Swiss-Prot record:
Protein name (record): Mu-theraphotoxin-Cg2a 3
Expression tissues: Expressed by the venom gland.
Cellular compartments annotated: Secreted
Principal cellular location given in the protein's record: secreted
Disulfide pattern: 52-66, 59-71, 65-78
Biological role: Inhibits both peak current and fast inactivation of voltage-gated sodium channels (Nav) channels. Inhibits the inactivation of Nav on DRG neurons (EC(50)=1.77 uM) and peak current of cardiac myocytes (IC(50)=0.90 uM).
Taxonomic lineage: Eukaryota, Metazoa, Ecdysozoa, Arthropoda, Chelicerata
Family: Belongs to the neurotoxin 10 (Hwtx-1) family. 37 (Jztx-31) subfamily.
Modified residues annotated as Phenylalanine amide in this record: 84
């Protein structure tokens, strides 16, 4: 019983690899299209300058955090500084 299960799984694995290789050959390699796709999505990968770091965002000093937030010394994130008002 165990041998038949192992043989069945092996055959299914070989069929999967064979079908994947045939599909890749039919469609062509995705690696040729990758650089164009990355260039079109370039703005996503660029870091944006923001006015201030919002709640739980990373920081190195208090001036980077938005109003009423301060930079915590231990994990360096912006958290509420306990103040209220506009």
């Amino acid at each position: 019983m165990k041998v038949s299960v192992v043989i069945t799984l092996a055959v299914l694995g070989v069929m999967f690899v064979w079908a994947s290789a045939a599909e890749l050959k039919e469609r062509g390699s995705d690696q040729r299209d990758s650089p164009a796709w990355i260039k079109s999505m370039e703005r996503i990968f660029q870091s944006e300058e923001r006015e201030c770091t919002k709640f739980l965002g990373g920081c190195s000093e208090d001036s980077e955090c938005c109003p009423h937030l301060g930079c915590k010394d231990v994990l360096y994130y912006c958290a509420w500084d306990g103040t209220f008002g506009k």
